[in-house]
């Protein structure tokens, strides 16, 4: 797609704004007493847990479609501050779209939508909400800047600028693994991504 149509900032939710992986422990600690994100989430879809502790992995999969769990997820540190700064910086440049993926619709969709509406209110940024439902997250064609924790989604995107938020499941990947772009970055947090975006000369 021509660059003239690529104006949006697209922001993922789980692993970027919402701390999902860091909140499994209470649900599986009876099966994996020493569970930590750092020790056990070694790759996408938790291959170590899936192989060695299938019952724990099944519980985690159930959490992915649990409305109460989805709504209860805490925001990472400085998400509100980052969203406020991004909203001010980008308001005359294009649309901010928060694009999330769920495996199910219905109540879990409503929970995620409510979570995002509250983020809108807290940050006072009227971002667009886009929720993909199904096996895979859809790829948006108007994205100029993509902020994600999924290497696969970054590779699929034609975004000009790509930001991988470092999480335990993507610890083995670098900027070179994110697919074609004008520039790619690996950063520690959404807030750090916002600071970098503000330094880009568009």
Residue ranges and their predicted role:
Residues 34, 43-84, 88:
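Metal-dependent phosphoesterase signature
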Residues 99-147, 151-155:
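Substrate-recognition "cap/lid" segment bordering the active-site pocket of phosphatases
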Residues 70-75, 79-112:
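Substrate-recognition element of Asp-dependent hydrolases with the DxDx(T/V) motif
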Residues 138-140, 192-202:
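Short amphipathic alpha-helix with an adjacent loop that forms part of the alpha/beta core around
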Residues 18-21, 25-26, 94-96, 105-111, ...:
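Short catalytic/ligand-binding loop motif for oxyanion handling, primarily in non-cytosolic enzymes
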Residues 2-59:
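Active-site neighborhood of HAD-like aspartate-dependent phosphohydrolases
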Residues 129-134, 180-193:
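Short acidic-hydrophobic, aromatic-tinged amphipathic segments that line or gate anion-handling sites
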Residues 145-185:
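Acidic, Mg2+-coordinating phosphoryl-transfer loop and its flanking beta/alpha structural elements
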